Amino acid sequence: MQNNNRQELQTLRDLIRYAVSRLNAARVALGHGSDNAWDEAVYLVLHGLHLPPDTLDPFLDARVLPSERSRVLDLIDRRVTERLPAAYLTGEAWLRGHRFHVDRRVIVPRSPIAELLDEGLAPWVRDPLQVERALDMCTGSGCLAILAALAFPVAQVDAVDVSSDALEVAARNVAEYGLQDRLTLRQGNLFEALPAAAYDVIVCNPPYVNQASMGALPQEYRHEPALALAGGADGMDLVRRILAAAPGYLSADGVLVLEIGHERDHFEAAFPDLQPVWLDTAESSDQILLLTREQLNT
């Protein structure tokens, strides 16, 4: 459709249909919150119209003003032509129903660990109220640290990242959730900035993409900070350091929950003697592992 014909797009239904067609025709890469063109289109249209993400049905056939249409079309055009993840266009990302501020200083929140935190890490954590200290390593936007603080309501949570830029984004999110009294942001290289503490839960979504996969990433992913993605030749550079140090920071019954994406083969090659529990979620399989302090010490 030529630009001068786009004035024919009169309703939300029209705009969503057009957006789906554009996204499909351009073969954009998805995976930053949406896994299909319909959901991506609905999100962009509703955001452009300043409507909550769960209010499509009442407005589906509502007509839009010319200024509203222009605003929505600009989002769609930029999504297609610049190959920017939708979250970078809107300045927000949603994870398990929670909204987080994001920009290009952090990767877009999408870790399936969020689902496990939503369930309180049951059955590995028997009572969320018994978790006194939790740690989010490589926190980025702070999303997992915040979800951990919500899951474990009496816990003191530390969140660590090497990037000062990422921690600025995380600080904004922590403030928006009013968690400054229980959630401490720390800048440092993995465990070096941490106090001497025993954590009941450590969650970590580290850089784990192997070198070959980094070179093949779709354009959308290349807008994200490489520091938060690249895990070295086999993707295990930081994982090795984390597993080596983690036992010294876990409580006697503490657990480490670690995301490694599609790198299970590389993980098992690097750590043939480890026997982690592999945790599945609704959206992932063989991407998250759990290890106890006892396992890490053997």
Curated annotation (Swiss-Prot):
Belongs to the protein N5-glutamine methyltransferase family. PrmB subfamily. Disulfide bonds: none annotated. It comes from the Bacteria. It comes from Bordetella pertussis (strain Tohama I / ATCC BAA-589 / NCTC 13251). Signal peptide: none annotated. PANTHER family: 50S RIBOSOMAL PROTEIN L3 GLUTAMINE METHYLTRANSFERASE, RIBOSOMAL PROTEIN UL3 GLUTAMINE METHYLTRANSFERASE. Its EC number is 2.1.1.298. SUPFAM superfamilies: S-adenosyl-L-methionine-dependent methyltransferases. Methylates large ribosomal subunit protein uL3 on a specific glutamine residue. The gene is prmB. It is an enzyme of class 2 (transferase). InterPro entries: DNA_methylase_N6_adenine_CS (IPR002052), HemK-like (IPR004556), Ribosome_uL3_MTase (IPR017127), SAM-dependent_MTases_sf (IPR029063), Small_mtfrase_dom (IPR007848). One of its GO terms (biological process) is methylation. HAMAP family: L3_methyltr_PrmB. It catalyses: L-glutaminyl-[ribosomal protein uL3] + S-adenosyl-L-methionine = N(5)-methyl-L-glutaminyl-[ribosomal protein uL3] + S-adenosyl-L-homocysteine + H(+). Keywords: Methyltransferase, S-adenosyl-L-methionine, Transferase. CDD domains: AdoMet_MTases. Pfam families: MTS. GO terms for molecular function: nucleic acid binding; protein-glutamine N-methyltransferase activity. This is Ribosomal protein uL3 glutamine methyltransferase. One of its GO terms (cellular component) is cytosol.
